[in-house]
Amino acid sequence: GTHITAMGADGDNKNEVASSVFAKADIIVNDSVSQCEVDGDTSFAIRDGVITADSPVELGLLIKDDIKRANDEQITLVDLTGIAVQDIIVAEMVCDCLLK
């Protein structure tokens, strides 16, 4: 098993993970499924017919529903295109840590 996090492809013309990798992934996670359908690596995999639009799990549901690998052999793939509110919260946490 392995884990891949893709976070550099934030546009419809950017791609860092081949669509064939999505076909091998047991669990696919997006920070925003609707956004990743249009931008980033997930959009290429959908356009290439390797996965369907309902294949990825949204990050919030992953946490809420406690979705995880069933065994160490599974492959997990996370495609993050960037959500402004998440960036703001992380930046706030970093600033808080720096000011302590």
Question: Model-predicted segments: where are they?
Answer:
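Acidic carboxylate diad motif detector
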Residues: A6-G8
